[in-house]
Amino acid sequence: MDLQMDYADLCMMVLEKFGDVPNIPLSARMLLEYAEVRLAKIGMNLEKSPLASGKTVGWDALFETSAAKILAVREERTGETVGIIWPFHPAAAWMCARKKAETAGEVTAAADALIKEGHRDRDGLFDNPVHPGQLSTEILAMTVPFLAWAGKISGEKRYFDEAVRQFKGYAARLYDPAARLWHPGYLTAEAAAAVTFRPTDQSILSPVLSLPEPGVLAGCWGRGEGYALFALSELIFELPEGPEKEELIRMRVDMLDSLLPLQDPNGMWHQVLNDWGSYPETSGTAWILYAVGRGLKKGTVDREKFLPPYLCGLAGMARYLAYDGSIFNGSVTCICPGGRGTAVDFAFAKWLKDEPHTVAPVLLSLQQAVQNECAKGLIPSLSEVLNQFTGE
C-alpha cells in the first residue's frame, strides 16, 4: 500500500471502482449509496483536504450527485439474505435526519407502515415474510437504523421505542452468552428439523455455545455480527440521552470487548469469528472497525483499551485493498451456507474478490477513520498506522 495515501484516498479508490457499477445488486446498493453520501458530507465538513495523495475531490458536487441519485429512486428493495424489503432507502432517511433532504413525510409514513404492517414472528420481531419466522441480523440493519432516523426526524419517542424493542428482542434470541457473540439468524421449526449438527461444528476459540432453540444458526458469522453492530451503533447515535441509551452503550461495549481476543495478530477478524481456522474476512472486520471508530469518536469506549486494536485493524484491512479499489477476502452472500449455517459451513464458504456486500462496510469504516483523524485528531495517519502495525 502506497504510504502517500490516507484513509480518504482508500475511500475514493473503492468508491471510484464500485460507485457507478450498474451490476451491483440492489441488495448491496442501498448501503453503498448510504456510505457514498455520508462520505461526501464528511468531506464537506472538513477544513482541509483529507487526501494525502494530493488529489482533489469536489465534496459538494459528490454530495449533490449522490443525493440526486438516491432521491430519484426510493422504491422498496430486498436485502442480502432475506426476503424482507427495506422500508425506505437508508440514505434518503439519513439525509432527512441531517436536514439534507425534504422527505420527512415519506420517512415517517414508511416507519408507520413498518410498525403497523411489517411482518413479525411470534415475539413481535420483524422477520422474513417469504419464510415467516426466519430471523436475520440483516433485518436489524434494515429496520432499526431506519426507525431511529424516523425518531430523529419527527421527535416522536414511539419510533425509538420500537427500534429499541426490536434490538433487545433480537439479542434475546440470537446473542450467545457463552460465546459472547451473535448468531446470524434463526430458522423456522420446519427448516431446523432438516439441520444435522456435527461434532466438527464446534469453533476452536469458543467451543462452548448456548443455543436456546434448535433453530438458531450455530455459526458465528463475522458479517452477521457486523449487521448487529451497525444497527446498534446507528441507534445509539440517534437516541436521546437517558438511561436507555446508557444501557445500549454498555451492550455495545460488551459486544466489542468480546471481539478483542478474536482479532488475529494481523488485525483481522475471521469469517467464523471464534475460529481462526476460517479465513480473515473483510466485511466483518470493517463493520467491527466502524463500530469501534464511532465509539472512539464519541468517547463511549475506553481509548486505552480499544485504540491499539482499532489501529491494528485499520492496517490489516488496508492490506486487503488494491490500488484499483478491489477488495479481497469478502464473505460469500449467504446467511445459511450449506443449508445449515454452522461454523464449518461458514468456514468452507469460499471468500470472494469484490463481493458487493463488502463495499459499504469498508467505505463506512474508512470514512469513520477520516473523521477520527482529520476532524477529531484521535488517530494517526494511515502511513503511520501501517508503519506501526506491520503484520506477521
Functional labels for PLM-detected ranges:
Residues 2-30, 37-91, 97-110, 134, ...:
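CBM-like carbohydrate-recognition segments
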Residues 177-182, 261-272, 302, 311, ...:
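Catalytic cores of carbohydrate-active enzymes
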Residues 11-19, 34, 85-98, 125-142, ...:
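Carbohydrate-binding/catalytic loop surfaces
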Residues 227-273:
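Oxyanion-binding "anion nests"
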Residues 46, 150-161, 235-246, 295-304:
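Inter-helical turn/loop segments and adjacent helix faces that build the functional surface
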Residues 32-33, 143-153, 229-236:
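Alpha-helical scaffold elements that line and support the substrate/ligand-binding pocket
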Residues 53-57, 61-65, 69-210:
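Extended ligand-binding groove/face enriched in aromatic
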